[in-house]
Amino acid sequence: MKHDPIELLARMAHVHATGEAGERVPWARLAPERREARTHEAAAMLGGLGRASYPTNPEGLTAPRDIASAAEALLDAWERGEAATGETMARGMPLVMALVRSGPEGTP
């Protein structure tokens, strides 16, 4: 399975935006145009996020596949209403940024 760090970052941005608005809209239920717009926003965000300090092995994970799976699990839990927006962002962003830093060779 290929894990797209940009899509995961877009999903994190979606969690932040909809969570702040008091909504909880699953990624899959967004119109394709909205998903594409969030993905473009995420790609543009990478320049600013590169200066932020994130751990290289969040939650003790080092393998890109494990990092991506953990991020996806957090996002899925948020969509099901099992995780708060703040918790999802606090735990998910370090995971996604570690995956982004792993580069294309880190994408299984």
What do the predicted segments below correspond to?
Residues 1, 89, 105-108:
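A broadly structural signal marking compact, well-ordered functional cores
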Residues 2-26, 47-86:
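Amphipathic alpha-helical oligomerization segments
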Residues 38, 64, 88-92:
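Hydrophobic packing residues in well-ordered alpha-helices of helical domains and bundles
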